[in-house]
């Protein structure tokens, strides 16, 4: 086997085993705000996952939020971040055509051999869809699991019939 292929295969296995692989990056509009959902694996036992949201516009990188790079001052007042175990949600307030470009979500596990994973999405205001109610609910699925378990319990106790 080619040594380069062996190294690439080993690195991809290590990246997945380290548990910080970005699985998807989606964008949508909530009122006039851009919402970026960066879903990722999380098999780490501590908070060693570092992240960065950035925008590349006109061949220039602008860091919006994160622990890897220094966020630009012009975005700090417009950005909010929700950080949960399997999803990081960045909201950019008052999204305009000046904010269009390629958005990136990068995750990195710190340590002796830092590994990183990223996804990108091209965002244009006239192509954005409105965020659906169901995707807002998916951010925190624990209440849905509780609801399903409660329905089963109520059905078992004959309080409701489905």
Curated annotation (Swiss-Prot):
Residues 1-19 form the signal peptide. PROSITE patterns: IG_LIKE. It is found in: Cell membrane. Changing residue 108 to R: In allele Thy-1.1. InterPro entries: Ig-like_dom, Ig-like_dom_sf, Ig-like_fold, Ig_V-set, Immunoglobulin_dom, THY1. Its main location: membrane. Pfam families: ig (PF00047). One of its GO terms (biological process) is positive regulation of release of sequestered calcium ion into cytosol. Residues 20-127 form the Ig-like V-type domain. Residues 132-162 form a propeptide. GO terms for molecular function: GPI anchor binding; GTPase activator activity; integrin binding. A lipid is attached at residue 131 (GPI-anchor amidated cysteine). Disulfide bonds join 28-131, 38-105. Glycans are attached at residues 42, 94, 118. May play a role in cell-cell or cell-ligand interactions during synaptogenesis and other events in the brain. This is Thy-1 membrane glycoprotein.
